[in-house]
């Protein structure tokens, strides 16, 4: 078994780590960064861009650049969260054939799983380059409060990227692993995880290598992106007041505003005031317009006060579900870039009554924990036991549209639970099992995970047939449900792949597309390399021709010039083999030039030697015998 990488697939940034010996190590990407922007762009030529390069072109290509795709993964197009996002995101969100939210880029529809797979494939390749070996196995993190559809969709994204996802692990749990791996004493900790798009809080008991999650809560649609939107609105409103122009209707200006808002928010974590300057943000008949707005930390905090208030509820619920008071929590671990904001830290201090622990890197700690979990699965990390929980209750719809819970939220996973139900009408030949996830009393208020039928029930009065329904949750938090007629032994089961989600066929097709794209990338690189080499060869040859001028014979010059022209023509096309063949021809023809240059240099050297001052006299004087010269005898004198 090769290395198992741990990936934090974040809303804003992603990070990858691996166990090297006994230590987890964050791997750098080809740009040298320890985190990679979770951004994908499709250029006008159809080229796929991921990470920093996609971020750099976002301003000029906002409609074909996707960020924050994690907020859409596993969600229905008709859901309120997607509707909210459609109002603020510059790219087009469309209805998929299965009812999921899809994204349209350059006229083609992509599922959020596919977009996420592009980021994962980039990270996989970066890890392979760093480690110098092929990587197939991975642990991927998700927000603790992700439902089954979102977990399954994340696993599918990994599969499309060519990864064997060994485990889906909750982000706060991963962070606790990174924090507590070397801790020997027992501790009760709270992990407060506020990232780019999601918010989680988990309460754990850790000690002696056991990490037991007692409860988890959160909001999968609350994070840094929401804070940014409020700053964007403020900047746009200020500009409208000043210039009478609403920048929100201009997608390019909106993208510049987004970048400026994010930067200002980050700057205000360390300073109390910043200035947002965006020259040439737009123009009207009177000429170009510039945005210049001062923003103070106090103003930012007043803008986002409602979001700060939303952080309290999940913390209080998590403590209550864990059966703990805030004073019993020994440490509060801050995770996610948004926890750098002083107002967030103050709110955490107020909720838990203590200063939060700032000893971990909030951007990297989740990936490090995932890397450690990879080490556990490989057997490299010993004596670590992870006991996670299911974040939401699971059950089925029963008579009257009620949700009957079989597995309560915060139940330790993996787990299996059965309950016997019966028919609601006389001689009922089949039962429809409607699988639900959530905390509401009525079925309509909860998330539908799937439906299936158990047929062939023998005629009997209502209440007589015994139908055993079994829920099974694996270590990834992914659900399977079965129903069995105890009278006939007939059984029907379903592995929940979400009521929509991607089918196996769609996933396989996307895997093939990804492999095809990798092959295309390889061909593009080969073409680029061949072109670069050919360009360099043409330049060097033309320079040599110019330098030699008339010092080479006409036929050699003609042959070389013809070879140059042929190669130049080939460079206009995309035939790699033709470019390589003509490059070789030009190299062979250029050898004649090299010979001519060598001969010229040699001739110049000889001519130079012949023309040295006094050389002729010296040669004549030394070579010609002189009749007047007499050879001298000598005798050795001994004392």
Curated annotation (Swiss-Prot):
Low complexity composition-biased segments: 599-610
Comp. bias intervals (Acidic residues): 625-639
GO terms for MF: ATP binding; ATP-dependent protein folding chaperone; unfolded protein binding
Location of Phosphothreonine modifications: 198
Entries under PANTHER family matching the protein: HEAT SHOCK PROTEIN 70KDA
Family indicated by similarity: Belongs to the heat shock protein 70 family.
General function of this protein: Acts as a chaperone.
The name this protein goes by in its record: Chaperone protein DnaK
Gene, per the UniProt record: dnaK
């Amino acid at each position: 078994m090769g290395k198992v990488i741990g990936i934090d697939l974040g809303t804003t940034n992603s990070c990858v780590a691996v166990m090297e010996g006994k230590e987890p190590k964050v791997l750098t990407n080809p740009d040298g960064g320890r985190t990679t922007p979770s951004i994908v762009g499709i250029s006008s030529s159809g080229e796929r861009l991921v990470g920093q390069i996609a971020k750099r072109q976002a301003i000029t290509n906002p409609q074909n650049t996707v960020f924050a795709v994690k907020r859409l993964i596993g969600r229905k197009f008709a859901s309120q969260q997607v509707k909210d996002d459609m109002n603020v995101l510059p790219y087009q969100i469309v209805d998929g054939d299965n009812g999921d939210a899809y994204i349209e880029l350059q006229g083609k529809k992509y599922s959020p799983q596919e977009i996420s797979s592009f980021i994962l494939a980039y990270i996989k390749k970066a890890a392979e380059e760093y480690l110098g070996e092929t990587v197939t196995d991975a642990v991927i993190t998700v927000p603790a409060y992700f439902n089954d559809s979102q977990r399954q969709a994340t696993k599918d994204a990994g599969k499309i990227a060519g990864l064997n996802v060994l485990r889906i692990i909750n982000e706060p749990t991963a962070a606790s692993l990174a924090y507590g791996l070397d801790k020997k004493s027992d501790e009760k900790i709270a992990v407060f995880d506020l990232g780019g798009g999601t918010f989680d809080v988990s309460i754990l008991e850790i000690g002696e290598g056991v990490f037991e999650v007692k409860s988890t809560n959160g909001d999968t649609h609350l994070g840094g992106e929401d804070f940014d939107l409020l700053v964007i609105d403020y900047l746009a409103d200020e500009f409208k007041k000043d210039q009478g122009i609403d920048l929100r209707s201009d997608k390019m200006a909106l993208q510049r505003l987004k970048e400026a808002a994010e930067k200002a928010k980050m700057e205000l974590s360390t300073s109390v005031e910043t200035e947002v300057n965006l020259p040439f943000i737009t123009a009207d008949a009177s000429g170009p317009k510039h945005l210049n707005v001062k923003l103070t930390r106090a103003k930012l905090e007043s803008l986002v006060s409602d979001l700060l208030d939303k952080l309290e509820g999940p913390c209080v619920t998590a403590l209550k579900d864990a059966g703990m008071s805030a004073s019993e929590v020994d440490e509060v671990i801050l995770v996610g870039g948004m926890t750098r904001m002083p107002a967030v830290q103050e709110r955490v201090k107020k909720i838990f009554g203590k200063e939060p622990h700032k000893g971990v890197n909030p951007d990297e700690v989740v990936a490090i924990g995932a890397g450690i979990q990879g080490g556990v699965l490989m057997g490299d990390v010993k004596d670590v036991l992870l006991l996670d929980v299911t974040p939401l209750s699971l059950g089925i719809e029963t008579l009257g549209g009620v949700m009957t819970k079989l597995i309560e939220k915060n139940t330790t996973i993996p787990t299996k639970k059965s309950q016997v139900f019966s028919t609601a009408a006389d001689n009922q030949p089949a039962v429809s099992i409607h699988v639900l996830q959530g905390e509401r009393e009525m079925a309509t208020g909860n998330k539908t995970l799937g439906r299936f039928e158990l047929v062939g029930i023998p005629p009997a009065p209502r209440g007589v047939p015994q139908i055993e329904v079994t829920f099974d949750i694996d270590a990834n938090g992914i659900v399977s449900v079965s129903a069995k007629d105890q009278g006939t032994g007939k059984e029907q089961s379903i592995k929940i792949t979400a009521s929509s989600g991607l089918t196996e066929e769609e996933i396989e097709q996307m895997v093939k597309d990804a492999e095809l794209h990798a092959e295309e990338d390889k061909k593009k690189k080969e073409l680029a390399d061949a072109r670069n080499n050919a360009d360099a060869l043409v330049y060097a040859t033309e320079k040599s021709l110019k330098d030699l001028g008339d010092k080479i014979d006409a036929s050699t010059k003609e042959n070389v010039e013809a070879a140059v022209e042929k190669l130049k023509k080939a460079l206009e096309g995309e035939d790699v083999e033709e470019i390589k063949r003509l490059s070789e021809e030009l190299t062979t023809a250029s050898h004649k030039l090299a010979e001519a240059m060598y001969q010229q240099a040699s001739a110049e050297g000889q001519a130079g030697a012949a023309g040295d001052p006094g050389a002729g006299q010296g040669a004549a004087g030394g070579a010609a015998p002189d009749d007047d010269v007499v050879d001298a005898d000598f005798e050795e004198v001994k004392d």
